[in-house]
Amino acid sequence: MSNNAAYLAPQVKTTSTSSKTTFHFAAGLCSGLTSSILLQPADLLKTRVQQSQQTAALLPTLKTILSSPHPIRSLWRGTLPSALRTGFGSALYFTTLNALRQPLAQSAVLTGSNGSANKGTKSSSALPKLSNWANLGTGAVARVAAGFVMMPVTVIKVRYESDYYAYRSLYGAGRDIVRTEGFRGLFSGFGATAARDAPYAGLYVLFYEQLKRHLAGLKHSGTADQPLAATSSSSINFISGGLAAGLATTITNPFDAVKTRLQLMPGKYGNMMRAVKLMIQEDGVRSLFGGLGLRITRKALSSALAWTVYEELILRAEIRWAEKAHAHV
């Protein structure tokens, strides 16, 4: 990250002209691909732990994978659908989020106190500053919209990663799902996914923006117009992303556990309420928190990586566009 980028950040104004949709899509795609490829083993382990009706332990599951003939390949099994889902899902999410936040940023009510959220405060970001309710709402809507579009890829990914079906290829997984369950099978677990993703994404954006503001205030006690250093900006975004993900993940993990069971065994579990009832009857309440440690680890790291990369790319682009606009004045 360049020092120029960090020191120009307070002067960059986020407008509908500079925040081009195509670049938000590209930045989201890049950040999503980076996090999904690096953290695929954690995602695979989470699926394996959650698929068990006896709530399998992490270490025995990992030991089984490592003892296979091709442990490295096994750990990254399902990387392609995961990268497609996370990469394009992130691209759609960040694009939709920006499209929602830009017009809301023009409203004094939704930015809070006549736009004071944007004035006289130190910032590690060039993104719009909104009220808590606006952050909660835009995060939830953007995530559910992106999740619906990417749902077929998500279902195929979960089935392919699981050893419950032992599919030999992604194409074979998709073909079998459509053949046995119809096209609606590609959307198995969407209700649980939406119930998990809407509050998760809303809470995440809310916590993330609050933590960034709080950490920026702790980091610098100088004048209000003092810009953040380059390392401070990236570290604040990374730490805020990780902490926000941990908090939101813990609150919404039961929905993730239910979603996994519905996607793996829709015939048995049927719907959300039936799945919750059966899981508690057969495995106890702890089954609703299966894979929590793995999910927190993966979500904290993936969210921190994705948002830090995304914020840096957007910040650099905003500055470049501002410089070009200034040069033509």
UniProtKB/Swiss-Prot annotation:
It catalyses: glycine(in) = glycine(out). It is a multi-pass membrane protein. Pfam families: Mito_carr. The keyword Transmembrane applies. Solcar repeats lie at residues 19-103, 130-214, 232-316. Mitochondrial glycine transporter that imports glycine into the mitochondrial matrix. Plays an important role in providing glycine for the first enzymatic step in heme biosynthesis, the condensation of glycine with succinyl-CoA to produce 5-aminolevulinate (ALA) in the mitochondrial matrix. It is found in: Mitochondrion inner membrane. GO terms for biological process: glycine import into mitochondrion; heme biosynthetic process. It comes from Aspergillus terreus (strain NIH 2624 / FGSC A1156). This is Mitochondrial glycine transporter. InterPro entries: Hem25/SLC25A38 (IPR030847), Mitochondrial_sb/sol_carrier (IPR018108), Mt_carrier_dom_sf (IPR023395). The chain crosses the membrane at residues 25-50, 78-104, 136-161, 189-212, 236-262, 291-309. Belongs to the mitochondrial carrier (TC 2.A.29) family. SLC25A38 subfamily. Keywords: Membrane, Mitochondrion, Mitochondrion inner membrane, Repeat, Transmembrane, Transmembrane helix, Transport. The keyword Repressor does not apply. It comes from the Eukaryota. GO terms for cellular component: mitochondrial inner membrane. Signal peptide: none annotated. GO terms for molecular function: glycine transmembrane transporter activity.
